[in-house]
Amino acid sequence: MRVNEKYSTLPAEDRSVHIINICAIEDIGYLPSEGTLLNSLSVDPDAECKYGLYFRDGRRKVDYILVYHHKRPSGNRTLVRRVQHSDTPSGARSVKQDHPLPGKGASLDAGSGEPPMDYHEDDKRFRREEYEGNLLEAGLELERDEDTKIHGVGFVKIHAPWNVLCREAEFLKLKMPTKKMYHINETRGLLKKINSVLQKITDPIQPKVAEHRPQTMKRLSYPFSREKQHLFDLSDKDSFFDSKTRSTIVYEILKRTTCTKAKYSMGITSLLANGVYAAAYPLHDGDYNGENVEFNDRKLLYEEWARYGVFYKYQPIDLVRKYFGEKIGLYFAWLGVYTQMLIPASIVGIIVFLYGCATMDENIPSMEMCDQRHNITMCPLCDKTCSYWKMSSACATARASHLFDNPATVFFSVFMALWAATFMEHWKRKQMRLNYRWDLTGFEEEEEAVKDHPRAEYEARVLEKSLKKESRNKEKRRHIPEESTNKWKQRVKTAMAGVKLTDKVKLTWRDRFPAYLTNLVSIIFMIAVTFAIVLGVIIYRISMAAALAMNSSPSVRSNIRVTVTATAVIINLVVIILLDEVYGCIARWLTKIEVPKTEKSFEERLIFKAFLLKFVNSYTPIFYVAFFKGRFVGRPGDYVYIFRSFRMEECAPGGCLMELCIQLSIIMLGKQLIQNNLFEIGIPKMKKLIRYLKLKQQSPPDHEECVKRKQRYEVDYNLEPFAGLTPEYMEMIIQFGFVTLFVASFPLAPLFALLNNIIEIRLDAKKFVTELRRPVAVRAKDIGIWYNILRGIGKLAVIINAFVISFTSDFIPRLVYLYMYSKNGTMHGFVNHTLSSFNVSDFQNGTAPNDPLDLGYEVQICRYKDYREPPWSENKYDISKDFWAVLAARLAFVIVFQNLVMFMSDFVDWVIPDIPKDISQQIHKEKVLMVELFMREEQDKQQLLETWMEKERQKDEPPCNHHNTKACPDSLGSPAPSHAYHGGVL
C-alpha cells in the first residue's frame, strides 16, 4: 500500500517519471517498455492514430481527454510541452526536472522565442504540470497534442493501462462477467407459446441490435478482484473493460488526484472551475454517418435509435446503457415505459371524447340553453358598456362543454388515477428487470456516496473559511507569549497536515444561514411574481372584455368570450415559457449559494427548487380557472371589484370547464411544441453555428482543409457539453402533471402527450448521439428523487380531479337536481333551476347598462347563474337552501371519490409485486451459483493443498528397507509393530 499526498491511498506500483528530450530520443537509448510514457514518434504520422481514438503508437486507446487553452508563439505552431514532477513540498514553484509529454511536433529548443506569458497563464501552466505529474504517479499514461486544428487549444490524451484498470475496478467494486454461465429460466406451456407469438408479431419493430435479442444464457457477475482474476474471462483484455467502464475509471482517478497548486483543490472539477482546464470528456467511439465509417456502437445507436425514421421501433436500452451508462439508460427506459403506458390512456381518452360527441344532441341542459323559445334574458357581464344578452347566444359554448363535462369524464378520472398507480408499479418491475440484466442487484447508493467527492465550490468555501480562521489564530498568537503555546497541539496539527482540508474543516448551518435566508425570500418572491402575473392577466381579460363589448360589430361582440380566453391563454403561455427559463437559472443560482458538498446533494436541491418554481409557474393559471374563476364574483347589484375598478369575471352559463380545457390544451401543447421541441432543436443548432463561425474567424485560411482532417477529440470538443438529465426529467414530469392533474377537463391530454413523446424520445436520442459530448457513465439503480415526485403528483391528481369534478363541472348539481328536484326524473328544467333572478331596479348607481333597450325591449328581470333567493322573497338575494344542498353533495363526493380512488390505487400497489417472480428466482439462482462457485474453488484449493502436502511428506520419508522397518507399512497400509522384523523373530 503506497501513500502519496497527491493521490488517494490505493495499492499501486512505484513509478518514476522519465525525463525525455524528444529531439534526441535515440541518444539515451529509451525503450518503450522502460516507463509509463511510451515514445510514439516512430509511428507513421499519416495514420493519424485512427483519427484521434488512439495514441500516436496506434495501440493504446484514448480513454479521456483534457482540454486547455494556451498562447501560441507568433512564429511557430508548436509549443514546448512539459510536465513537472517535483519532490519539493507541495505548493513550491521550483522545478526539479522538466520533461515533455509525447506528442506531435514536440520541441525543447531553449531559444524558441516563446512570448512572455502573464501571471495567470503561467500559474495555470504550473498547475497543469503538477496535476499531470500526479496523474502519471497514479499510473495513467498521457500524450499531449498542441498542434491542433483549433487555434489556441491543447489536448492531453489519457490512457489507463491494464494494471490501473484492474486496481481501480477492484476499488470501485465494479461487477464484471465471470467465466461461469447459466441458463435463464424460460416460461413454459401456454405462456411460452404466447411469448413466441408476440415475438413474431413485434419482430418488425424490434431494433436490429445484438444486445436487444432475448438471451437464454447469462454470465455470472462478481465484483472484480485481482486475487480472483482466474474467475473472469480475460482471453481478450482489450475488450474486457469496454470504453464506458474505462472512461469511468479514469474519471474517478481524475476526481481524486490532488493538485496543491490549485489551493488544496481536489480533482478535475476544481481545475475546471478555476479555468486550469477548459474541458474534460471521454471520446465518442467514432463517427455516426458518412462513407467508409468504421462500424461502432455510436453508429449503431444512430441507425437503430437516434433517427426519426425508426420512431416505431423499441429502444435498444441495453446498448444505450452500454454506451452511456446506467443513469442515462434508466432515463430512456423510464421514458419508454411512460410512453408505452400512454397508449391505453390515450385510447380510453379518445373513447370518452367520442362519447361526448355522440351524446351532444341528447344532452338536455345544452338543448334547453340553445332553445330560443325559452327567451331567457341574462344580466350584463360588465358594468355600463355591456348590455343584456340572450342565453341562446351561448349555445355553441354549452354544446362544446358537453364534450368534456359528461358522466364519462368521472369514469376517466377514476381510470387515470388507477393508471398512474399501475404505471408506477409497472416501472418498478421494469426497473428490477433492468437491475438484474445490468448486474445492479447488489449495488447500493451508499457505495457511490462514499466515493462522491466534494464540489469545487465547496472546497473553495472551506478554503476561505480555513484561511479566515488561520488569520484570526495568528492575530491571537501575537498577544500570547511563545512559551505558553501548547506543543502537543502543534504536534497534532502537524500530524493532520496530510489530511484533506474538507475533512478538517466543514461548513455548518451558520455558514449557510445567509444562503438559506436568501433562498426562502427569493422563492417566496418568485411565487409572488407568478401570482402577480396571473392577476395582471385577469385584469387584462376583464378590461379586454369591456373594450370588446363597446365594439359596434355584432360578430366581435358575439365572440367576446372566445377572443378574450384565447388571447389571455397565449399571453399566459409566453409568460410561462419565459419564466421557466428565468426560474431555471434562479434555481441554479440559489442552489450554488447554498454550497452543497457533493454533486448528488447539489442535484437534489436544484431539482426541488426548480420543480417548485416551475410547478407554480405552469399550473397557477390553470388552478385559477379551475377553482377560483366565478367563485368570488358576487351578484348583480353587489359585485366584487379588484382595485375598486375591475369587476371579477364570471364563468359561462355552461360552466368554466370548457375554458379550463382551452387553457390546459393551449398551455400543454404550446409548451411541448415550443419549449420541448423547438428549443431543443433550435438552441443546440444555433450554438453549433456560433461555435463554427468563431472557429472560422480564429482559424488560418486553410480552415476547410483542416476541418476535414480533424481528430476525434477535436470534433468532440466542438460538441455541446452534457448538462445533466434534470431538464429532460423536468419537462416530462410537468407533462405528467398535465396528463393526470386536470384530466377530468381534458380527456385528450394523454393522446397529445403520447404524440409528443414519440418525437421526444428520438429527439433526445439524436441529441445525445450527435449533438452532445459523450457523458461520463454513472452507475444508478433507480431514477432517484424523480420517483418520489411522480408518486406525489399521482396522489395530488386524485384530490385535484375530485375537486374539478365536484366544483368546476356541473356533474354534482345535475345529480342533485335529478334525484331531489326533478319532477319527472329527467334533466328538463335543470338550466332554469341553476339560474337566479334579479330586479334591474336594484343595480348600484353607475353600474346599469348604458343601452337597456339593446335587445329591443325593456328588461325588468334578468337572470344570473347562482343559487339565491328571488327579488320577491323576504330575504331577497340571500343564498338559498339549494346552494347548501349542492355544496354538501359536492363535499361528500370529494371525500368519497378521494378515499375510494386512493384505496383502489393502494390495492393495485399491493396486488402487483415490485419484483417479478421470475427475476426473484433468477436472483436467488445467481446467489446459489455464486456460493457453489466459491465452495468449489475452496474445495479445489483444499485438494491442491492436500496433494502438495502429501508430496512433501513423501519426499521427507526415508525409503523402506531391511535396516529401517519402523516406517514401513504392512499390507493393510498400517505401520508394522515395533517388535516385528523382516527376516527374523525375537
From Swiss-Prot:
GO terms for biological process: cellular response to heat; cellular response to peptide; chloride transmembrane transport; chloride transport; detection of temperature stimulus involved in sensory perception of pain; glial cell projection elongation; iodide transport; monoatomic ion transmembrane transport. Residues 79-121, 951-986 are annotated as: Disordered. It comes from the Eukaryota. Induction: By IL13. By IL4, likely as a result of IL4-induced cell proliferation. By wounding in airway epithelial cells with levels decreasing significantly during the healing process. The record marks 428 as: Unlikely to bind calcium but may play an important structural role. Ca(2+) 1 binds at residues 677, 731, 760. ATP and calmodulin are essential for its activation. Channel activity is inhibited by CFTR protein and by chloride inhibitors such as niflumic acid (NFA) and 4,4'-diisothiocyanatostilbene-2,2'-disulfonic acid (DIDS). Activated by heat with activation seen at temperatures above 44 degrees Celsius. Activated by BDNF in radial glial cells. It is found in: Apical cell membrane; Presynapse. The term 'anoctamin' was coined because these channels are anion selective and are predicted to have eight (OCT) transmembrane segments. There is some dissatisfaction in the field with the Ano nomenclature because it is not certain that all the members of this family are anion channels or have the 8-transmembrane topology. Calcium-activated chloride channel (CaCC). Plays a role in transepithelial anion transport and smooth muscle contraction. Required for the normal functioning of the interstitial cells of Cajal (ICCs) which generate electrical pacemaker activity in gastrointestinal smooth muscles. Acts as a major contributor to basal and stimulated chloride conductance in airway epithelial cells and plays an important role in tracheal cartilage development. Required for CFTR activation by enhancing endoplasmic reticulum Ca(2+) store release and is also required for CFTR membrane expression. The region spanning the fifth and sixth transmembrane domains probably forms the pore-forming region. Belongs to the anoctamin family. This is Anoctamin-1. It comes from Homo sapiens.
